[in-house]
Amino acid sequence: MATVKKDARLTSSQSLMCVGFAGIFSKTVTSPLEVVKILSQVGTFHCKRGFLHSFVLICQNEGLRAFWKGNMVSCLRLFPYSAIHLATYKNIVNLHIDELGDISQWRAIVAGGLAGISAALATYPLEVVETRLIAQNCQEPTYRGLLHSLSVIYRNEGLQALYRGFSLTVLGAVPFSVGCYAVYINLDKLWQERHVRFTSLQNFINGCLAAGVAQTLSFPFETVKKKMQAQSLVLPHCGGVDVHFNGMADCFRQVIKNKGVMALWSGLTANMVKIVPYFGLLFSCFEMCKQVCLYRNGYIISPPSYKLKPGVDQSLGPYELQEFKRYLRNRKSHKAQSSSIGNRW
């Protein structure tokens, strides 16, 4: 997947803040596409007549604000998910790096997959709540916000309902990782043959293509997971799910039997359309936030220009740079005091 490159000139909290803000911004802007995708996966009536008509039906039945159903929960989930993912990924990578500090691309992708599973496990109840909020009619809501949703689901359906379908996250990670690996290996060969220096644009292209292939391969697992998250016997129309089933295997069977194999890829169009604007906004917003932090840390003259500050060692970390500046100030102060004493004599 496309990744925002870690910059040693940022503190850990600044990196997390930049990723979080960029994620919130890109999620919020592309939320209408996410809503259409999830409603298509669940199988609600909005999406029976295709991608474009889904927007019309949602707007007619629930209004414009329906395109941001569940977005607040999705944004709140981003921070614990990112923190757990980053910490787990670092620990796994540290176990597999060689003597030179390098790690193979396959191991790095597997580490990313395992970190993703760990982060998903910790934040899975929030994902279930997001799906329920999107699947419900916001004009006649059963759930009102995060805490109310968690309490109602737990009270009416038990703790297991908050983890229903999690096994599909694990199963879907396999084709997802294979897809990422295949794309990155082939793209690396392509860039090397052209003998060009790797740029941010290439990283963006790699990320979009890898996301497209990996998400397409793992999409059936994601579709069944969304149906399992949304289905509930205590909700009107069983949560809006278009097939009735008992468990994961039966869900696959019923979807194929009643809707056809291609129904496992319902919502893929919205997902593909979302990839480029999502990653474009993510990268752009991250870079803007990073430049503000670099300015505050004393590495650049101003955020818009991104001109490096003369005389500043860009290889120093933020804490090292502050210590170095403090040392220079103390040294200058000491020299001034020595000069003052010499003048008196």
UniProtKB/Swiss-Prot annotation:
Tree of life domain: Eukaryota
Keyword presence, Transport: yes
A single GO BP: transmembrane transport
SUPFAM superfamilies the UniProt entry points to: Mitochondrial carrier (SSF103506)
Keywords of this entry: Membrane, Mitochondrion, Mitochondrion inner membrane, Repeat, Transmembrane, Transmembrane helix, Transport
Recorded topology in the membrane: Multi-pass membrane protein
GO cellular component, one term: mitochondrial inner membrane
Residues spanning the membrane: 16-36, 67-87, 109-129, 165-185, 204-224, 261-281
Pfam family name, one: Mito_carr
Chain positions of Solcar repeats: 11-100, 104-195, 199-297
Compartments where found: Mitochondrion inner membrane
The keyword Mitochondrion is assigned to this record: yes
Signal peptide: none
Family: Belongs to the mitochondrial carrier (TC 2.A.29) family.
Protein name in the entry: Solute carrier family 25 member 43
Record organism: Danio rerio
Name of encoding gene: slc25a43
